[in-house]
Curated annotation (Swiss-Prot):
UniProt KW keywords: Oxidoreductase
The protein's name: Pyruvate synthase subunit PorC
Molecular function terms from GO: pyruvate synthase activity
Quaternary data: Heterotetramer of one alpha, one beta, one delta and one gamma chain.
Catalytically driven reaction(s): 2 oxidized [2Fe-2S]-[ferredoxin] + pyruvate + CoA = 2 reduced [2Fe-2S]-[ferredoxin] + acetyl-CoA + CO2 + H(+)
InterPro entries, alphabetized: Oxidoreductase_gamma_subunit, PorC_KorC, Pyruvate_synthase_PorC, Pyrv/ketoisovalerate_OxRed_cat, Pyrv_flavodox_OxRed_cen
SS bond partners: none
The gene coding this protein: porC
Enzyme Commission number, as recorded: 1.2.7.1
Classification of source organism: Archaea, Methanobacteriati, Methanobacteriota, Methanomada group, Methanococci
Signal sequence annotation: none
Pfam families cross-referenced by the UniProt entry: POR
Naturally occurring in which organism (per UniProt): Methanocaldococcus jannaschii (strain ATCC 43067 / DSM 2661 / JAL-1 / JCM 10045 / NBRC 100440)
């Protein structure tokens, strides 16, 4: 089983990102779960969401404490949240930042998802770009399924733009780390 923990801030779409990733895994023929961590979140406050992906039925119904991957939508969280807490020894981090030299003690993949979101969407909402970036560095889900999940989640032009943001991030990660 592959377990992914998303870190973001309220209003950044971390919960939606976890759901899109799970839906993409489903379209790829896998079993999946996506769920948020509910607390006293408010816009801008740190939030977490989770996705599980497996080739067989998932029976666990608890928070993910030892993820295989961590996806960080906002690098400023590094100042206040231990985003790598519990990350498995061979785990990896995908983080939205312009810095390429982050040392988090784990394999770290960086992408300027904010820049992509601003270019493609016109707003700094990075959730779909981060799912595309994750697909690009891991291959756990296909970009075709990611785009299909996005188009199911967001209708019309909004869906098309978000699918484009995911594809741009996916291709950037393939170019950078492929």
């Amino acid at each position: 089983m592959i377990e992914i923990r998303f870190h973001g801030r309220g209003g950044q779409g971390a919960v939606t990102a976890a759901q899109i990733l799970a839906k993409a895994a489903f379209y790829d023929g896998k079993f999946c779960q996506a769920f948020p961590f509910f607390g006293v979140e408010r816009r801008g406050a740190p939030v977490m969401a989770f996705t599980r992906i497996d080739d067989k039925k998932i029976t666990l119904r608890c928070q993910i404490y030892e993820p295989d991957y961590v996806i960080v939508q906002d690098a400023t969280l590094l100042e206040s949240v231990n985003v790598v807490e519990g990350l498995k020894k061979d785990g990896a981090v995908v983080i939205n930042t312009v810095k390429d030299d982050l040392d988090l003690g784990y394999k770290t993949y960086t992408i300027d998802a904010t820049g992509i979101a601003l270019d493609v969407l016109g707003v700094p909402i990075v959730n779909t770009a981060m799912v595309g970036a994750f697909a690009g560095v891991t291959g756990i889900v296909s970009i075709e399924s990611v785009k299909k999940a996005i188009l199911d989640t967001f209708k019309g032009k909004l869906g098309e733009k978000n699918a484009k943001a995911a594809e741009v991030a996916y291709n950037e990660m393939l170019k950078k780390y492929g």
